[in-house]
Amino acid sequence: MIQVQTILNVADNSGARLVMCIKVLGGSRRRYANIGDIIKVAIKEAIPRGKVKKGEVVKAVVVRTKKGIRRTDGSMICFDNNSCVIVHDTTNQPIGTRIFGPVTRELRVEKFMKIISLAPEVL
C-alpha cells in the first residue's frame, strides 16, 4: 500500500537506491498503489555512474509491499520492505538489466513479462 511520500527501495541495477513516491498513476483521486501498479517517483539516493541520477523524476512499478497481496486461494504474500523497479516513461520496460529479490505472479497479469523473466524468483 504505497501512497505519496512513501520511501521505497529499488530492486534493479539502474543506479538508484532509494526513491520517493510523488504520484500514484491511474486516476485523479487514486490514493494507494499495490503490487503491479505504476507510480511516479523521485530519485532520493543513487550510486555514481548509474543510469539515473539523484533528483530525476521517473516511472516505477511496485514489485514488493509490506502490506502484501491476497490470492484467490486465501493465501497472503507479504514482504519485509517496499520495493519498485524503475521503467521507461513510454514503453514501461525496465531500465536496469537485473532484478534483485523475489517478485509475485501478479505482475504477469499487468503485462510486465520482462520483469518476471529477469527476476531470480517468482512467488
Curated annotation (Swiss-Prot):
Answer whether the UniProt record assigns the keyword Metal-binding to this protein: no
Molecular function GO terms recorded: large ribosomal subunit rRNA binding; structural constituent of ribosome
* InterPro entries membership: Ribosomal_uL14, Ribosomal_uL14_bac-type, Ribosomal_uL14_CS, Ribosomal_uL14_sf
Q: Does the keyword rRNA-binding apply?
A: yes
Annotated signal sequence range: none
Its GO biological process annotations read: translation
Give one Pfam family. Answer: Ribosomal_L14
Q: Which UniProt keywords apply?
A: Ribonucleoprotein, Ribosomal protein, RNA-binding, rRNA-binding
UniProt xrefs under CDD domains? Ribosomal_uL14
* Single GO cellular component term: cytosolic large ribosomal subunit
Q: Which domain of life is it from?
A: Bacteria
SUPFAM superfamilies this protein is in?
Ribosomal protein L14
Question: What is the protein's known function?
Answer: Binds to 23S rRNA. Forms part of two intersubunit bridges in the 70S ribosome.
The similarity comment for this entry is:
Belongs to the universal ribosomal protein uL14 family.
What assembly does the database describe for this protein?
Part of the 50S ribosomal subunit. Forms a cluster with proteins L3 and L19. In the 70S ribosome, L14 and L19 interact and together make contacts with the 16S rRNA in bridges B5 and B8.
Q: What is this protein called?
A: Large ribosomal subunit protein uL14
Species source reads: Buchnera aphidicola subsp. Cinara cedri (strain Cc)
> What is the gene called?
rplN
